[in-house]
């Protein structure tokens, strides 16, 4: 048989129907139809339009934002270097490929030191798109408290735990510009 297929939390799917406690969905980024327990699907209004799109390129380590001005017309709002998630289990993993909905925002996303319950610092202007993956500014490690604008490593190699790190001013732009549940993050290779 096909076995179990797991999509990441926040992945965009098309709603096809429902039976009992299940929704029938078709993921946008892979072919097929699946029955998924209702508790794992958040239905958006069928009139939802995604006019704000963030594209993250893991291969080139950069990020771009696009805004739909009208049907068929898109404007590039920004293009910047970034770093994505690296493969270093158990604490760091690659930024997942796919199409996700911006779900939550935190002006300061507090993170823990690897393997510890101790606060490691915070990432400014964090916009969550799947599980623990955020688009955010340059991390600020304790004991430091002031925001850091830029890091020499942006645009080089994967360095984060799963997130998309970019200049803090650009993270603030995305944070302010991309409405929750009406913006997409598309991660490509």
Regions picked out by a protein language model, each given a short descriptive name:
Residues 18-20, 28-30, 41, 59-61, ...:
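Solvent-exposed coil/turn segments that connect beta secondary-structure elements
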Residues 95-97, 109-189:
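Exported/periplasmic cell-wall-interacting domains
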Residues 7-8, 16-18, 45-49, 56-58, ...:
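Extracellular/periplasmic catalytic domains that process cell-envelope and extracellular macromolecules
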Residues 78-112:
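Flexible, glycine-rich surface segments
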Residues 2-6:
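Short, small-residue-biased leader/transition segments that mark boundaries at the very start
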Residues 8-11, 61, 169-176:
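Solvent-exposed, polar/charged alpha-helical surfaces in well-ordered, non-transmembrane soluble domains
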Residues 7-39:
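SH3/SH3-like beta-barrel superfamily modules
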Residues 36-89:
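A structural motif detector for short, solvent-exposed N-terminal "entry" segments of globular domains
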């Amino acid at each position: 048989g096909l076995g179990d297929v797991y999509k990441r939390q926040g992945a965009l799917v098309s709603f096809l129907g429902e039976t009992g406690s299940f929704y029938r969905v078709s993921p946008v980024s892979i072919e097929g139809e699946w029955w998924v327990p209702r508790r794992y699907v958040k239905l958006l209004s069928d009139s939802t339009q995604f006019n704000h799109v963030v594209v993250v390129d893991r291969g080139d380590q950069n990020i771009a934002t696009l805004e739909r001005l009208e049907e068929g017309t898109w404007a590039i709002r920004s293009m910047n270097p970034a770093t994505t998630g690296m493969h270093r289990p158990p604490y760091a993993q690659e930024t997942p490929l796919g199409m996700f909905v911006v779900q939550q925002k935190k002006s300061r996303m507090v993170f823990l030191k690897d393997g510890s319950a101790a606060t490691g610092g915070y990432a400014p202007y964090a916009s969550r798109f799947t599980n623990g993956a955020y688009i955010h500014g340059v991390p600020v490690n304790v004991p430091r408290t002031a925001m850091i604008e830029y890091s020499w490593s942006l645009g080089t190699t994967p360095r984060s735990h799963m997130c998309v790190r970019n200049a803090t001013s650009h993270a603030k732009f995305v944070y302010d510009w991309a409405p929750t549940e009406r913006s997409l993050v598309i991660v490509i290779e």
